[in-house]
Swiss-Prot record:
InterPro entries, per database record: Hydrophobin, Hydrophobin_CS
Industrial or biotech use: Hydrophobins such as dewA can be functionalized for use on orthopaedic implant surfaces by producing surfaces enhancing the adhesion of human cells such as mesenchymal stem cells (MSCs), osteoblasts, fibroblasts and chondrocytes. Improved cell adhesion potential of human cells on these surfaces is not coupled with enhanced bacterial adhesion and therefore does not introduce increased risk of bacterial infection.
Keyword Signal listed: yes
SMART domains according to UniProt: HYDRO
Species annotation: Emericella nidulans (strain FGSC A4 / ATCC 38163 / CBS 112.46 / NRRL 194 / M139)
Name of this protein: Class I hydrophobin dewA
Mutant phenotype after disruption: Lowers the spore wall hydrophobicity.
Amino acid sequence: MRFIVSLLAFTAAATATALPASAAKNAKLATSAAFAKQAEGTTCNVGSIACCNSPAETNNDSLLSGLLGAGLLNGLSGNTGSACAKASLIDQLGLLALVDHTEEGPVCKNIVACCPEGTTNCVAVDNAGAGTKAE
C-alpha cells in the first residue's frame, strides 16, 4: 500500500513539473510572448505579421509545397516558391514546419514578414530571421 501511495505521489510530482514545458509547447503562435518579442519593432499597418520559409525549405517539405501550389499560403515577395502564413492560420492548420518551439513559446522558424491584405506577396520586415530559435 505504501509503495502505491509513494508511486502515485512521485507520478503526480513528475507530471506537475512537466506541465510548464508542455504548456509552452502547446501555446498558440498568435498569443505567444516569444513571437511578440521576435516581431518587436516591426510595423505592418496594411496586413498581418506572418512566418515565412525560404524556397529551398519549402521545396523540401512536401506539405508546404502542396499548400503553396494550391494557393493556400502567400509567397514572400521576390522569392517565388516561398511559403508564408499568418500566425492565426498557422495555429488553425497546425503548420508546425513554420514554427520553432522555445521555452518561452513558439516563434517563427525563419523569416518574419508583413502580408498586406488582398495580395499574394509578403514582405520581410526588420528582425527577419533574427528571432530566438530553438537549438
